[in-house]
Amino acid sequence: KMTIEEFSAYAEIYWQKSIRPDLLNGIYQPTALKRAIIEKDDGSERLLAIPTVCDRLIMKAIAQVLSPLFEPEFSDYSFGFRPNRSQKMAVKHVQDCIATKRHTAVDVDLSKFFDRVDHDYLMTKLGRKIKDKGLLELIGKYLRAGIMDNAGQYFESRIGVPQGSPLSPLLSNIVLDEL
């Protein structure tokens, strides 16, 4: 377990020595994500999968690189997990539709969506735009990194995108955009 502050000192030593070369050579192996459980407003539980600080930073960098590639093609009517968009903007859009007599609106809450994303389908969609095979392989490794629960038991990840990953909102929108 490492804090962001502790990671700074760690990165000074290991970034040039091992992390960067491993990333560039395609041999970097993400760490299993840590299981966290949060209680939702309705009393049910949401399972999160929290990456290490190092993996979180790498995933955030991947998201920053991929976002300009995919964002321009997303529907103007999609507001969830999007940069420069908010729930208030979605509400305003619905109000504008009502005011202009366009009365059709859809509020979609897909049950356990993050847990059910098909990796092959997602990777195929990513492969249509991303030509860097090393980047595609790294994203695949993150999807399959697995989850470690609080008792130290490891669970494979064969399906789904982890809630708690900085890359998951973008990946989920890539899958959902066709809706």
Walk through the language-model features, giving the residues of each.
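Short, conserved beta-strand segments within well-ordered enzyme catalytic domains
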Residues: 1, 37-39, 47-51
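Non-catalytic, polymerase-adjacent accessory regions of viral genome-replication enzymes
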Residues: 1-13
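Secondary-structure junction/capping motif
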Residues: 3, 49, 86-89
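Conserved polymerase palm-domain catalytic core
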Residues: 18, 22-26, 30-32, 36, ...
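A short catalytic or substrate-binding loop motif that flags glycine-/basic-rich loops and adjacent residues
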Residues: 29-30, 40-42, 54
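Conserved pre-motif C helix in the palm subdomain of viral-like polymerases
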Residues: 45-74, 158-179
